[in-house]
Amino acid sequence: MIVLPRKYGKASRKCSRCGDHSALVRRYGLMLCRQCFRELAPKIGFKKYN
């Protein structure tokens, strides 16, 4: 059985840091899940405003 890579849908993209498929932040080409984004956001220049 040959398994082809996904071309569309949730399983076609994964977090570039941990490999998770859920809750991806794709904006600006980040490709990070939300947990990794929250850890890395201050280092990559994102600021939290109230």
From Swiss-Prot:
The Gene Ontology CC terms held by the record are:
cytosolic small ribosomal subunit
Protein's GO biological process: cytoplasmic translation
User: Where, by residue number, does Zn(2+) bind?
Assistant: C15, C18, C33, C36
Give GO MF terms, alphabetically.
Answer: rRNA binding; structural constituent of ribosome; zinc ion binding
Q: Which cofactor does it need?
A: Zn(2+)
InterPro entries registered for this protein in UniProt: Ribosomal_uS14, Ribosomal_uS14_arc, Ribosomal_uS14_CS, RIbosomal_uS14_euk_arc, Ribosomal_uS14_sf
Q: Which UniProt keywords apply?
A: Metal-binding, Ribonucleoprotein, Ribosomal protein, RNA-binding, rRNA-binding, Zinc
Pfam families noted in UniProt:
Ribosomal_S14 (PF00253)
The UniProt note on the cofactor reads as follows:
Binds 1 zinc ion per subunit.
UniProt superkingdom: Archaea
Coiled-coil annotated spans: none
Subunit record text: Part of the 30S ribosomal subunit.
Function in brief: Binds 16S rRNA, required for the assembly of 30S particles.
Q: Which family does it belong to?
A: Belongs to the universal ribosomal protein uS14 family. Zinc-binding uS14 subfamily.
HAMAP family cross-referenced by the UniProt entry: Ribosomal_uS14_2_A
Q: Which PANTHER family match?
A: 40S RIBOSOMAL PROTEIN S29
Name used for this protein in its record: Small ribosomal subunit protein uS14
